[in-house]
Amino acid sequence: MQIQEIARALENFAPLPLQEGYDNAGLQIGITGNECSGALLCLDVTEAVIEEASRLGFNLIVAHHPLLFRGVKCVSDSTQVQRCIRLAVQRDIAIYAAHTNLDNARGGVNFEIAARLGLQKLDWLSPLPGKDAGSGLVGELPQPVDAQHWLATVKQQFGVDALLYTPGPKPQIQRIALCGGAGEFLIDRAAEVGADLYLTGEIGYHHFFGHENELWLAALGHYQSERFTIDLFERLLRNNFPDLPTAQTTICTNPIHYL
């Protein structure tokens, strides 16, 4: 099948109009009419990931985070993005990104997180007007649990070295709001809908203040909160193209390390 068929299937699941205004989802590099030899699935595009795709003989990379996010004024070798562009073109490897459109789609990134947390009665945290889509989710655990014990379980489940949190007013929680990635913009909304705890990937230092009488706040880490997006990509492609060779990257692209 052609690369454009794969892009079409991804966009049927997560339409590009669902992406945020600042985003740049879709085909980033490549010729849509080329036959696809295989797809490497990743969170971030790096030179090492492109080399991995080349070694596998794959000519498509499907990533969550766009390589081309801000304007590129030249293609040399002075930045990581420029080097990735050159390498992808040299190796004839197409790059496709499904970012906030996949975050906002039903069944997308946040649903992947909610399923692993065992949440029920899911609803959009911040619905997009007139669409069955939105930013974040809110749901319930089957029964109230001790918040610190639950966070310790989540830390282990998501492979987190350090989970950041601020306690809320109640030791037990049941109603959970969540958003993968950088979700501090939804803290107030989580409080408005009565969440006992809001879980996201990143929260800036100052945003942890002022909510201790409303809800617990917890940050997993951006990479850790979205790492299962690769599983979602694999299911989507296998369901639509069972004969297409796919592989999850073996490279951890998280640039943050812990001592």
Model-derived segments and their meaning:
Residues M1-L259:
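Hydrophobic structural segments
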